[in-house]
Amino acid sequence: MDKSSGELVTLTPNNNNTVQPVALMRLGVFVPTLKSLKNSKKNTLSRTDATEELTRLSLARAEGFDKVEITGPRLDMDNDFKTWVGIIHSFARHNVIGDKVELPFVEFAKLCGIPSSQSSRSLRERISPSLKRIAGTVISFSRTDEKHTREYITHLVQSAYYDTERDIVQLQADPRLFELYQFDRKVLLQLKAINALKRRESAQALYTFIESLPRDPAPISLARLRARLNLKSPVFSQNQTVRRAMEQLREIGYLDYTEIQRGRTKFFCIHYRRPRLKAPNDESKENPLPPSPAEKVSPEMAEKLALLEKLGITLDDLEKLFKSR
């Protein structure tokens, strides 16, 4: 629904865009690859609290689940995200029979952004590990009281089968999660920016997060962007990664921004977003906003803000805490 006009807008995926559930974009399910050898050899099991976003699903509402957690291998942007895009496209474009969709393997590879010129072996080496990681990602819905616990455990994708000799792919989804694939709070994610950011996974991840935000978003804290990337390096190094990624997004023409400081906290003010990487005919529609003036903060408040940042507590975390009370 377009809030400005009241018109119902249908979002349809094609080769240049995909419909991505907002929850998966904001939560950081898909993150940059851990580059260092030290980090890459660590246990890369990822655990994400998805309660705020996914308790809106009818499954959670019907069963009264009040906690949702996503657990599984760390999903990267360069391969796993593109495979997930292919899965979304497959269910959107092909006839779903029961809980399964079937299509040619070569077409599925194309939907994942893999050139058809690659050999069958190369296709397998890229798609197979990604399908295993995505199918290995668990979503658990639960509710616990003083005496009892109820829990429903499922997967991002229930099963995947392919046969390159027969040129076939079969994907199976949990019917109770079809709503996640067709979430009513979704945005049309342009793939043009993703393609322009090849091998720049941090910029790709921040793009999926920023593109999921509403129009004229509030300033985004540096800490929030660090959390979205879910890196394991020291904070100062993570800050450098975030700033470099933001600059890469500006270089491809996706956005413009200003970095400001309020007290001890750094923020990014987004002036405009251009997922098509070109200016619209009427640039006034972008409503560029000037950066908000820095607020005067007392020394006592500055100390409190510094302590929160040191503990890794963001303003978003505080807002969630107050809402839950």
UniProtKB/Swiss-Prot annotation:
Biological processes annotated in GO: DNA replication initiation; plasmid maintenance
Cited Gene3D superfamilies: Winged helix-like DNA-binding domain superfamily/Winged helix DNA-binding domain
Pfam families linked to this entry: Rep3_N
GO molecular function: DNA binding; DNA-directed DNA polymerase activity
Keywords in alphabetical order: DNA replication, DNA-binding, Plasmid, Plasmid copy control
Start and end residues of each stretch annotated as Disordered: 279-298
Bridged cysteine pairs (disulfide): none
Protein family per UniProt: Belongs to the initiator RepB protein family.
Function: This protein is essential for plasmid replication; it is involved in copy control functions. In vitro, binds to the DNA repeat units, BCDD'D'', EFG and HIJ.
Protein name: RepFIB replication protein A
Organism whose genome encodes this protein: Escherichia coli
Organism lineage: Bacteria, Pseudomonadati, Pseudomonadota, Gammaproteobacteria, Enterobacterales
The encoding gene: repA
